[in-house]
Amino acid sequence: MNGVLIPHTPIAVDFWSLRRAGTARLFFLSHMHSDHTVGLSSTWARPLYCSPITAHLLHRHLQVSKQWIQALEVGESHVLPLDEIGQETMTVTLLDANHCPGSVMFLFEGYFGTILYTGDFRYTPSMLKEPALTLGKQIHTLYLDNTNCNPALVLPSRQEAAHQIVQLIRKHPQHNIKIGLYSLGKESLLEQLALEFQTWVVLSPRRLELVQLLGLADVFTVEEKAGRIHAVDHMEICHSNMLRWNQTHPTIAILPTSRKIHSSHPDIHVIPYSDHSSYSELRAFVAALKPCQVVPIVSRRPCGGFQDSLSPRISVPLIPDSVQQYMSSSSRKPSLLWLLERRLKRPRTQGVVFESPEESADQSQADRDSKKAKKEKLSPWPADLEKQPSHHPLRIKKQLFPDLYSKEWNKAVPFCESQKRVTMLTAPLGFSVHLRSTDEEFISQKTREEIGLGSPLVPMGDDDGGPEATGNQSAWMGHGSPLSHSSKGTPLLATEFRGLALKYLLTPVNFFQAGYSSRRFDQQVEKYHKPC
């Protein structure tokens, strides 16, 4: 993760772990690349500041709610409060980072001095002409993109790298061109190639939506055969795909990146086209700004050689009292409220999840025997039911048809079937169900004859949810045990009621009222009637 918590401030940039955010209260996103959005998801519930393009992509692709996204115009200064009473404020200015669509640098100004966070950026001399950087401001801390901060790594400019790609394509006039890209970035390169070779560039629907948002030239399509230049995911550029593509049409692949990649096929070409500043560009940028200190953004990479370009360091700023209260309160009260809000908004699990009939049909006989032995080992014998309570996750005393006036009607009842956890609105399979006489009115005579039901079941036993209410589990599971036991006041379910219970558990109430049958449910019944 490439993000920072700026010390002695409530500011966090590209940092989305609330557990480690401490006193951070203001969150900023530089761009939408995945290494800068680790921990950011649809559950995010705090104000977040970014550029308008990033705001659109953030809501579109990560489903972050719009109520938390604050889009700030690029090139303009914005005043934000640093406490709860508006006594202390700071100014933040967004500058184009020349990295990918929507990427920006953040210039923070406040009691802490002046801080510039570059994020990922590709330096150009025109950046020094930004009004926010030309007013003689002293940069106290420069958070620098040090991805390519290595004197041994020499990179061409993007114009030079683009020229190399054009020359390579010209050497293969009859070939299809596969250009491997990440999910965001290098759209301007694709536009340049399309205009250079007067051909359509084939994109995925997702990237096409992006280029339309950027307002680029109308040179992109999703039709596979419309043009010979195809933008694909960089992971698709591999040896096996090269063989497959060349079987139908001569194809070369281009990876525009500064990373060291071993080419697994002679037609895969790596061109050092980078959206990160080269070492020489970083040196020029730091020398022009003369910050008091340089802090690398990518902690795993080296970042040195700037000592001769630094200004004298200043002392640690004093945090105003109102800001201290603002920062300390953010680590306690909001976190508790945020957790409560998330719990209240959590969707209630409803419905039934069944095991796939195809999966059950594909089980081997050995697996079924193993499950049968396990059930026999775990299931108590009828004679033991009086001596020990049921240890099944549920001890249910529930009507076959739910009481519409009961408060429990909307509650999901968890149960386990075939070692899979599911939820159900009625009593689970493998348990006797306590029927009441009022249930009989739901069952028509035609339905009784269809499922082989004789006389109605007479309810007996206690109504207090004790051990008697659990019934005879062995009789339901079909282990050949007697269908009754010595416990007094326990409802007895004969063999013919197995089809009834299964059908009613798997079938909604309106199914019986309609008076028709379902082949899928019959298959479920046949499966459970088959001997193990």
Swiss-Prot record:
Q: What is the effect of changing L506A?
A: Abolishes interaction with TERF2
Q: Name one GO cellular component term.
A: nuclear body
Principal location: nucleus
Q: Name the keywords, alphabetized.
A: Chromosome, Cytoplasm, Cytoskeleton, Disease variant, DNA damage, DNA repair, Dyskeratosis congenita, Exonuclease, Hydrolase, Isopeptide bond, Nuclease, Nucleus, Telomere, Ubl conjugation
Notes on activation and inhibition: Beta-lactamase activity is inhibited by sulbactam.
Q: How is it modified after translation?
A: Ubiquitinated, leading to its degradation. Interaction with TERF2 protects it from ubiquitination.
Q: Which Pfam families match?
A: DRMBL
Q: What is said about its interaction partners and assembly?
A: Interacts with TERF2; the interaction is direct. Interacts with MUS81, MRE11 and FANCD2. Interacts with HSPA2, HSPA8 and HSPA14. Interacts with SPAG5.
Family per similarity comment: Belongs to the DNA repair metallo-beta-lactamase (DRMBL) family.
Q: Could you identify this protein by its name?
A: 5' exonuclease Apollo
Question: What organism is recorded for this protein?
Answer: Homo sapiens (Human)
The taxonomy runs: Eukaryota, Metazoa, Chordata, Craniata, Vertebrata
